[in-house]
Amino acid sequence: NFIILNKIIDVNRTLYIPEILKFSYLPELIIIEIYDDPSTKITNKKSTIFVEFNNNNYEYILDSICLRDIKKQHVGCFITLNKDDYFFDGDSKHRIKLEPWNSETLLNKSKIITFTRESAKFNLMSGYQILYYFRNN
């Protein structure tokens, strides 16, 4: 079971992600969708978020992000594999590379990620993105 946070809290309107979320049930997965324009203004993306349920706090860990490139033509993914951070771009010749991304500093920093000068350019502070958080406890 999962929950799409935007159905409950419009992060694209409020321009922030709450510190602690409260739901009527405990999902395995929380999905946060951030649109193009708000992506430049939401500066509190977290690698860990918490849900309060039945007077207990549950931890959710950011596992992956699907991100559209800055020209709005292509999608790449930041993924976690064996506890390491990678960037995947199926359109690139090399396709996957080790790329540390899962920290508050990097999640909220304007930094171009690309494989080569000719390939698509991605930026976590500029583009449509979907964040996937899995329950850790």
Enumerate the predicted regions with their spans:
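UBL (ubiquitin/ubiquitin-like) substrate-recognition surfaces
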Residues: 1-137
